[in-house]
Amino acid sequence: MDCLDKIVQLKKMGKKIGFTCSTFELGPHSGHDVMLMECKQNCDFLIVGLLTDPTISRPEKNKPVQSTFERWIQITSNKYVDMVIPFDTECDLEDMLKIIMPDVRFCGEEYKGKTHTGSNIEGIKIFYNKRNHSFSS
């Protein structure tokens, strides 16, 4: 069963599909774990989009030190994560959101009130992760 078939099956079962994304560089560390735990507490099935290299869409960002495969291994082994889907660009992210149509998308609270990739897609509830800790994220 491929990723999309699995998601369709879960939706038919009435499961709440959640989605979050990040580069997850040098992690997952404690900040990532707290964020992923909060995501999983608010959905039945958590999909994580793994940004391969943020410099592709945003040259001002830092290139990851770890390979995509290293980061994929770390994220797939996290107990709160049910599926990991790598993506390359913000355009890929928007397409992925339109295809998956998760019930809830998790974003950091620093995005509240701001336009961000996929924020214009109707039908996806946005949940803003709290940053009420001092861990890096």
Q: Model regions: which residues?
A:
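Nucleotidyltransferase catalytic core that binds NTPs
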Residues: 1-137
